[in-house]
Structures are given as C-alpha cells and as structure tokens.
C-alpha cells in the first residue's frame, strides 16, 4: 500500500514506511509504528506548507515477519521474487502463498511485476522499535542504525528410529531428540569459535515425532535462526553448523537434512541517509546513539535498490514479539519528529 505527496512520477521520491503484520502473540508496535509515523510525517509536512523539492511516499509492506518466508512485500518491490519462490512458498500448515492469496481474491503472480525502478527512489527511511534492550538500558530516545543484520534460517530434520521407551537399551537407540539436544548444546561453542560479538543462533521451534511419552522420538524437526552483520561470518557459521550436525548424526546413527527457509545478506546503511538522521537528532537535541540492528527489516531489502537508513526508538526492557512490547509515548514522539526532520532534509 502506498500514499504519495507531491508525486508526479518524474522526480525520485523519498519513501518512509515499514510493515503491518507481526508474529503470533506479539504487541502493537512492531512494524505498525513505522507505517503510522510515515503517514503522520506526510500529513505534518503537507499541512505545514514546507517547500520540498522531492515527492514523499509512505509504504506498508506485506508479510515482513514471514508466514511464507518473510519480507515478501519488499522483495517484490526490489524485484527479488521469482516464479520458483511463488511455487515453493508455504506456511507451517502447508498452505501455499499462491493459495492464500487466491482465497483473498489476489493473484500472487502479480508480485513478479511489482519491481520498482531504482531510479524512482531517492532514499528510503524506516522508523522501527529497536526490539532489543540497548536504548532502554541507556536511557536514550533514538538509535541511528549503521548496519542491519543478515541471517539464514533453516528447517532441520534429524531422522532415527521410533521404538519402545522401556525395552530399547540406551546404547541401542537412534534417538532423534538426543541428537537435537546435543546440537543445541553445541550452539554456544560454535558461536564462540566461529562467530563474532554480533552473532546469534536460536532454535525457536521444535517438533518431535511420533510425540508419545513412551516412544523414542524417531524424528526431530526444528528451526535454526543464525544472524550476524558480516556476510563472511555467516558463511563460516553455516559451514560450522553443517559440520556439527553431520558429526552428531554419524555418532548417533541418525540421518539429517535441512532446507533453507531464508537467506538474507547483511547491509550497511547509506551514509547520506545516516547523516540526515544525525542532523535531525542534533536539530531536535535528542539523546541518541549509533547501533546495529539485530533484526531483519524491509529496509535491508530496499537497500538493494535505494539509499536506505533506519531510526530506532526504545523497546521497554527490550521486549518485542511479545504482548509486553511497549515504547513510551515520549519516545514515540521523538521518533516521529526525527522521521519528519529526516524526510524534510532528504526531500529538500
């Protein structure tokens, strides 16, 4: 969804936006804050009568959080969606992206023609909650983002042999859960040996089959989410986790396979946009710091076609993807004003 101000299609736009979707059980600010503040920024600048040399746009991207893999809207705009992706994209219930869109009267194939001409975008700015504890703990209102993390997300399947829990000796088992447990216990070691201070790895979803209390799990299916702000570090970590899985599978008489759900490169924010955010912060005399984003955002996709930057506001106690997600109204006001001043400078 787009809103446009002073747009005639001839001059590259300055765009602000984010996404409206979020994860199950989440709060009300993730993504939505950036969309609402983008609309408010356009309203304020229009009503103030400020003379701008460039048009402004507000955008709301779809499926950033990833029912079908994540960042679908921004990847469509960036020209990264392929027919193969549309064919393969499914949610955890096996419902395909194509099917879900058809149920709403939409044609997923239209995403193949949604690419924005890079020459039509002067800059993109995204206001977002930090989703981490740094700003809140430091008592700061604004985070100026220097880099956005990259990530790879796998679905891993360890296959052994389901068997009776009481009659199968411990040394004669091919227990898929024991393989998963050993792998989980190796995460800290892998990060310490091959990662950086910015590296994270998370197992966020686990399914054991057949799932009975008196049956040895014959299959363990789980997710692995690994992040860092450096592409080479991510490649090294991917290799280290593959080797760790292979060694555990051999030792425990298991088979393993994995599929790549997401593979997103880290990006550095554009220095001209970062400078515009810095100037806005200085003008408003707001307490701020520079930091990296540990979460993926639409901004890192749009960075492939346009100069991009991000503005963070604090998350109370660092909580996000939770009903406890909260940002103080004073900080929201500071973020909205920083966005307004940033857009004004970029469009001047």
Map each language-model feature to its residues.
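A non-catalytic alpha/beta surface segment that caps or lines the substrate-entry region
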Residues: 1-6
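Zn-dependent metallopeptidase/amidohydrolase metal-coordination segment
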Residues: 17-18, 287-338
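Acidic, glycine-rich active-site loops and adjacent beta-strand->loop/helix elements
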Residues: 20-23, 56-67, 131, 162, ...
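Flexible, glycine/charged-enriched surface loops at secondary-structure junctions
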Residues: 51-52, 111-115, 167, 189-203, ...
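Midchain, well-structured core segments that form catalytic/ion-binding scaffolds
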Residues: 63-231
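Short beta-alpha connecting loops at secondary-structure transitions
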Residues: 83-85, 227-231, 261-263, 318-330
């Amino acid at each position: 969804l787009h809103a446009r101000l002073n747009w005639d299609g001839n001059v590259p736009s300055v765009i602000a936006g984010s996404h409206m979707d979020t994860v199950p059980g989440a709060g009300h600010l993730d993504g939505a804050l950036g969309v609402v503040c983008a609309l408010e920024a356009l309203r304020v600048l229009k009503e103030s009568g400020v003379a701008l040399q460039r048009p402004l746009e507000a955008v709301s991207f779809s499926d950033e959080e990833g029912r079908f893999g994540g960042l679908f809207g921004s990847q469509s705009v960036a020209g990264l969606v392929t027919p193969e992706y549309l064919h393969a994209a499914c949610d955890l219930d096996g419902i395909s992206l194509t099917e879900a869109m058809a149920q709403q009267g939409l044609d997923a194939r239209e995403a193949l023609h949604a690419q924005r001409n890079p020459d039509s975008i002067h800059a993109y700015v995204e206001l977002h909650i930090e989703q981490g504890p740094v700003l809140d703990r430091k008592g700061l209102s604004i985070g100026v983002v220097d880099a956005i993390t990259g990530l790879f997300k796998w679905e891993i399947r360890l296959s052994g042999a389901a068997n009776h829990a009481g009659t199968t000796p411990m040394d004669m088992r091919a227990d898929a859960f024991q393989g998963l447990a050993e792998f989980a216990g190796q995460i800290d070691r892998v990060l310490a040996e091959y990662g950086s201070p910015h590296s994270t790895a998370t197992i966020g979803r686990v399914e054991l089959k057949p799932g009975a209390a008196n049956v040895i799990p014959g299959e363990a299916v789980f997710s692995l989410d690994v992040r860092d702000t450096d592409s080479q570090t991510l490649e090294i970590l991917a290799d280290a986790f593959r080797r760790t899985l292979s060694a555990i599978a051999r030792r425990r008489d298991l088979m393993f396979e994995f599929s790549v759900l997401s593979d997103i490169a880290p990006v550095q924010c554009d220095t001209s946009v970062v400078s515009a955010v810095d100037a806005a912060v200085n003008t408003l005399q707001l307490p701020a710091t520079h930091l990296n984003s540990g979460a993926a955002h639409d901004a890192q996709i749009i960075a492939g076609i346009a100069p991009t930057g991000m503005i963070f506001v604090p998350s109370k106690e660092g909580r996000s993807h939770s009903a406890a997600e909260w940002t103080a109204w004073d900080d929201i006001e500071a973020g909205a004003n920083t966005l307004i001043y940033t857009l004004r400078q970029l469009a001047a």
